[in-house]
Amino acid sequence: MPADTPIRKKPNAYASVVDPDTGYCTPGAFELERLFWHGAPKYTHVNEVWPNLYIGDEKTALDRYSLEKNGFTHILNAAHGRWNVDTGPEYYSDMTVEYYGVEAEDLPSFNLSQFFYPAAQFIHKALSTPNSKLLVNCAMGRSRSASLVLAYLMIYKNMTVVESITQVLKHRCILPNRGFLKQLRELDIKLALEKRDTHGTANKAQKDD
């Protein structure tokens, strides 16, 4: 290779992405991980992280008596399946609960992003129902369930990935695995580009008028 030939660097998963139009910077994966290094509430079984939206663990999901007593109306199990948190509609058949199961593994290689929009839609619909109370659970209530709640806040509440993490960390000790963080980062970039395109289209329409 000639000495003056530029060397192309491979894309860096840890690099930040800047939208030149809005100035918003999607942090790199390492920068996102650093958000969890700071203080968070002491770990407990369940916490309200947004009005009427709770993140909890397996113990919480299995305690039908407490769920009914505390008025839960919807449950999203992010660890659905026989070898995970084995609940399901039948488990809650004696309760007035709407159930949604996501068969996800807490592995960095698992594609959780395929469930971001369906789960967010379920959460949005549940919270739009008067007097609703929603539990999103997985085994520990720290990775899978937290990631789906973060995606919901980004998709429906127009939060950036940093804003959503900051919001949830105020109320619960969470720690999505690195693979999930990268997928949330990709979602953040996608949503930022959509906002930019929408803003650009709106500006063009105003100029045309």
Curated annotation (Swiss-Prot):
Any one GO BP annotation for this protein: protein dephosphorylation
SS bonds (residue pairs): none
SUPFAM superfamilies hit by this protein: (Phosphotyrosine protein) phosphatases II
Annotated catalysed reactions: O-phospho-L-tyrosyl-[protein] + H2O = L-tyrosyl-[protein] + phosphate; O-phospho-L-seryl-[protein] + H2O = L-seryl-[protein] + phosphate; O-phospho-L-threonyl-[protein] + H2O = L-threonyl-[protein] + phosphate
GO molecular function: MAP kinase phosphatase activity; protein serine/threonine phosphatase activity; protein tyrosine phosphatase activity; protein tyrosine/serine/threonine phosphatase activity
Residues that coordinate or bind substrate: 137-144
InterPro entries reported for this sequence: Atypical_DUSP_subfamA, Dual-sp_phosphatase_cat-dom, Prot-tyrosine_phosphatase-like, Tyr_Pase_dom, TYR_PHOSPHATASE_DUAL_dom
EC number: 3.1.3.16, 3.1.3.48
Active site per UniProt: 138
Localization in the cell: Cytoplasm; Nucleus
Keywords: Cytoplasm, Hydrolase, Nucleus, Protein phosphatase
Protein family (similarity comment): Belongs to the protein-tyrosine phosphatase family. Non-receptor class dual specificity subfamily.
Protein name: Dual specificity phosphatase 29
Species in which this protein is naturally found: Xenopus laevis
